[in-house]
Amino acid sequence: MATGKIIQVIGAVVDVEFPQDAVPKVYNALEVKGGATKLVLEVQQQLGGGVVRCIAMGSSDGLRRGLDVEDQNHPIEVPVGKATLGRIMNVLGDPVDMKGEIGEEERWAIHRAAPSYEDLSNSQELLETGIKVIDLICPFAKGGKVGLFGGAGVGKTVNMMELIRNIAIEHSGYSVFAGVGERTREGNDFYHEMTDSNVLDKVSLVYGQMNEPPGNRLRVALTGLTMAEKFRDEGRDVLLFIDNIYRYTLAGTEVSALLGRMPSAVGYQPTLAEEMGVLQERITSTKTGSITSVQAVYVPADDLTDPSPATTFAHLDATVVLSRQIASLGIYPAVDPLDSTSRQLDPLVVGQEHYDTARGVQSILQRYQELKDIIAILGMDELSEEDKLVVARARKIQRFLSQPFFVAEVFTGSPGKYVSLKDTIMGFKGIMNGDYDHLPEQAFYMVGSIDEAVEKAKKL
């Protein structure tokens, strides 16, 4: 192992000088010796003259020039396999849950090539989530990529927790959760939520919180992805949850300028599309197994044209857009049924009945949206009888799109509901056909299946 010396420290970026004949490769892991705590650096650039520029995976406080640095001769390696289930790890794969060693049989490098073209598989199978609005409007493909888009505080993390809970309990699959640059409190809540639902032994948790240095946040998504790839290569169908993909971009922005790159649009790194591609191209399904990924995407200032969410859009099969306007009506999950899309919503994939129901729901809601201005100025009485009926049904549909979540029982005070796709289609079809025109709209708010709405109406 070659040894070098630190010659410069600028925040999270550290320059190390090695002998000319032993310069480490790009992405190699280097370990700083003689520091107070273990610190790993990752080589980003070779500057010439034996000098490499690295990103620190931990805090660079206390580093000084002249400290010895040892080349590990391989990229950062993390534990993979069943030993990681039920554990919380950091970017380096070290346990942070005080439960002792991981006890893994194998470690994999976090930088890997994406599967080759001939290994990829294309599946048309749907993944039922039990969340009405998602299953109806933007169905998920097994082995597909889903983005949860939303501004601050509209429920991305809660939606994600509900998905993990439903999939672990109803489909008994393995999940990997990568917390990228999110709040420590959320990570803690998440851990306890998984423990309470008895699904912790089916989830591997990898955290790099907001307070961690940018190098840590930039690589923690790859750590989680590597663990998911191992499960996939064992022939399993695994779920990968990334919360939040925007912070991954942001970490890249933070180190980009320090690495000496010129910023591009809105101050983002010039390599934005490539960095996103490196991560997204590996999240894919092969002939052995599948990775279905759900990624939360923070939308800065609710602007979907910002370069970061716009770059993410290109990679996704389904987009679930969470809207502040819908959240303000008290309708949760606050999914916007007119803005959310899925490639799977095709009669050849989901069947004609599902397709017609989803499009019918959207057209009624769209018409209601158009009539809102007239109602605001002239009032309901000025509408034609036909339009009054559309408005009444649209308001019922809007309320029926809400649903009590298992993970939000604490907030809502009502027990969570899992609704099968069959019941979802039956319910919305009934409302559209006018079977429930006699029920008050409050009966449809925060219920599971349509039968519950009928029961609730009797009590009102």
UniProtKB/Swiss-Prot annotation:
| GO (cellular component) term, any one | plasma membrane
Membrane topology term reads: Peripheral membrane protein
Where mainly found? membrane
Identify the InterPro entries for this entry. AAA+_ATPase, ATP-synt_VA_C, ATP_synth_F1_bsu, ATPase_a/bsu_AS, ATPase_alpha/beta_chains, ATPase_F1/V1/A1_a/bsu_N, ATPase_F1/V1/A1_a/bsu_N_sf, ATPase_F1/V1/A1_a/bsu_nucl-bd
Q: Which CDD domains match?
A: ATP-synt_F1_beta_C (cd18110), ATP-synt_F1_beta_N (cd18115), F1-ATPase_beta_CD (cd01133)
As for subcellular location, the record says:
Cell inner membrane
Tell me a Gene Ontology molecular-function term this record carries: proton-transporting ATP synthase activity, rotational mechanism
Q: Write out the residues that bind ATP.
A: 150-157
Specify the domain of life of the species encoding this protein: Bacteria
| Reactions that this protein is recorded to catalyse | ATP + H2O + 4 H(+)(in) = ADP + phosphate + 5 H(+)(out)
What S-S linkages are listed for this chain?
Answer: none
Q: Does the keyword Chloroplast apply?
A: no
Matches recorded under PROSITE patterns: ATPASE_ALPHA_BETA (PS00152)
Q: Which UniProt keywords apply?
A: ATP synthesis, ATP-binding, Cell inner membrane, Cell membrane, CF(1), Hydrogen ion transport, Ion transport, Membrane, Nucleotide-binding, Translocase, Transport
Instruction: State the EC number(s).
Output: 7.1.2.2
Q: What class of enzyme is it?
A: translocase
Subunit structure comment from the entry: F-type ATPases have 2 components, CF(1) - the catalytic core - and CF(0) - the membrane proton channel. CF(1) has five subunits: alpha(3), beta(3), gamma(1), delta(1), epsilon(1). CF(0) has three main subunits: a(1), b(2) and c(9-12). The alpha and beta chains form an alternating ring which encloses part of the gamma chain. CF(1) is attached to CF(0) by a central stalk formed by the gamma and epsilon chains, while a peripheral stalk is formed by the delta and b chains.
Which PANTHER family does the record associate with it?
ATP SYNTHASE, ATP SYNTHASE SUBUNIT BETA, MITOCHONDRIAL
The entry's function note states: Produces ATP from ADP in the presence of a proton gradient across the membrane. The catalytic sites are hosted primarily by the beta subunits.
Q: Which family does it belong to?
A: Belongs to the ATPase alpha/beta chains family.
State the protein's name.
ATP synthase subunit beta
